[in-house]
């Protein structure tokens, strides 16, 4: 008999695009078929203020922390915060750099994002990442016409990780939560440039992910209908109604990886051009 799949939070902190971490995290989590990582990606983290904000999010949804930060002061700060919170924390590149240093007889240059060629494509991706982080979870809704893609959906439909994945490919992506009974911003309805896509999933899948979120955040009050499948079905019906009314395509993410969802969105962009 197969074990039911469980979920855990995987926090990826990078001072560059986060692709190295994403690859390492997925390679490791793929070894655990009964546990699925809920990925939280924090790219371009280069100041203590940014680190503090990241750990505010981690405190709400604790889990495993992987990081690639070459600034040693910031790295020590991350290690200290993890130790204080009792959370597992790994500097992914540090063991590799140690081996290189031992063999080559010289310390690493500690250059941020040194693995990336500083060409036009790289700067396009950085610009997209900055835009995406500034427009996460409904922030700055007046700027929707500056986006290439806008993802909408109820809570726990993978809007943020999908947005960051697309941004890593140079696609400026905003995401807006759909809340039952609350109209979407008028700036979204009137936007003419972006591809607007609704992300949906089964009530069972969303309930499962939300329950795991609650388990990791027992200190906060959570309404009972947050995980109730009947209530979630109402939220989903409202989201579908909005998308149908405005002619926005929908993608069911229930059985899709982030990469598969992103690929479907890129395909939709190609058709709409």
Curated annotation (Swiss-Prot):
InterPro entries: Kinase-pyrophosphorylase (IPR005177), PPDK_reg (IPR026565). ADP binds at residues 153-160. It catalyses: N(tele)-phospho-L-histidyl/L-threonyl-[pyruvate, phosphate dikinase] + ADP = N(tele)-phospho-L-histidyl/O-phospho-L-threonyl-[pyruvate, phosphate dikinase] + AMP + H(+); N(tele)-phospho-L-histidyl/O-phospho-L-threonyl-[pyruvate, phosphate dikinase] + phosphate + H(+) = N(tele)-phospho-L-histidyl/L-threonyl-[pyruvate, phosphate dikinase] + diphosphate. GO terms for molecular function: ADP binding; ATP binding; phosphotransferase activity, phosphate group as acceptor; protein serine/threonine kinase activity. Pfam families: Kinase-PPPase (PF03618). The keyword Kinase applies. It is an enzyme of class 2 (transferase). It comes from the Bacteria. Keywords: Kinase, Nucleotide-binding, Serine/threonine-protein kinase, Transferase. Its EC number is 2.7.11.32, 2.7.4.27. Belongs to the pyruvate, phosphate/water dikinase regulatory protein family. PDRP subfamily. Bifunctional serine/threonine kinase and phosphorylase involved in the regulation of the pyruvate, phosphate dikinase (PPDK) by catalyzing its phosphorylation/dephosphorylation. NCBIfam families: PRK05339.1 (NF003742). This is Putative pyruvate, phosphate dikinase regulatory protein. It comes from Mesorhizobium japonicum (strain LMG 29417 / CECT 9101 / MAFF 303099) (Mesorhizobium loti (strain MAFF 303099)).
